[in-house]
């Protein structure tokens, strides 16, 4: 009887279940969206029970539609939207408040206060992160400070905290396992990435009782088994977990030091594996844990680009330049260049390496000769320029030159963008056959833990190339184009 690994990809707008076979190929998948709540401007929340319901629904869909039985699932891997925070009652299992999503800015006042008290360097030294509403620590503090009775219950040991992986493992195991993995713990602003434990001093500053926190385990590990009443009468090992970007790095088989991947989604997330050493960034990058496996922890440098695919959506929905995003490629290829036009898509500020939340989107170099095609091409090129900003910061911090860039996400179907990316970086860009690398990474982590796959070398052999984009641009032209981008960013930042 053939067996499979079930990967649960719990994202910001939907939950997906994907069944993988021994060759790392997709057998079946299901997806279900859930509600986004915006109680105030800048706030983003989810209903944690609704997320759980969506996960159960996609698992049921995959099992019933694929025709396999639950006994054929060798293990379950989880990958999740990172930083999103759930606090729930240990006895009843009910969340005390909505899940506060990674995008939500509702803790900006808390962050401002912590920065004013001079804590930024302390958090950075221990966690590799900045004090920012993005991360979980201030979200937990906000819930304890703002939900009636929450702090008292937390101090009595009655409340639990978890990122989405922790919440799902707790629910799937019937409340038996309160755990997280190293990659998710490293995004909380409460975990010391050098000592590999929750940091008492940081917990004290944030006012978060240690009793709320999950046990931190390797990313490839049998955490618990599912309770049978949710899983068709079977106890299935829950055996792997990683935050979505780290999971994509694993799914792209970036196992060696200096290997990197860029995910082109709503924004871009670029990660470079730095091996067993954590590199402290001097250039606006985050230092994070890639995964913990085989008794060792791998670290990564991470750069965040806030606007990527959403810039293409803006051309489609806001400016109505085309009806389907896939048409952006053919429009861009109708012209030889942007004719000097630069689009800086800073709709919500700029991320790595600038970290400027006040700058706004700008367009430079317009003339009477500028056409729709020039504008579309310039917007697509902005994704590649921002990626170069991040890669330059990574190479400066690590003294490692990237040999190839592996790519995934929705925008990688755009051949024009991928070729321009390779040209600009002067590095080959590799697009894999399977674009679902985030879900695949979680499947691999679970599969290794249950012996479905032997080790990372077996997985590396499964990585198959769809297309390699070799750089073709002359150095002089590349430098000239990038200098124009740098001028445009500088001008955009000056205009506030």
Curated annotation (Swiss-Prot):
Residues reported in the UniProt entry to bind ADP: 12, 16, 266, 309, 410, 414
Name recorded for this polypeptide: Glycerol kinase
PANTHER family: GLYCEROL KINASE, SUGAR KINASE
Superkingdom of the organism of origin: Bacteria
Sites where the protein binds sn-glycerol 3-phosphate: 12, 82-83, 134, 244
Family: Belongs to the FGGY kinase family.
Native organism: Bacillus subtilis (strain 168)
Metabolic or biological pathway: Polyol metabolism; glycerol degradation via glycerol kinase pathway; sn-glycerol 3-phosphate from glycerol: step 1/1
Main EC class the enzyme belongs to: transferase
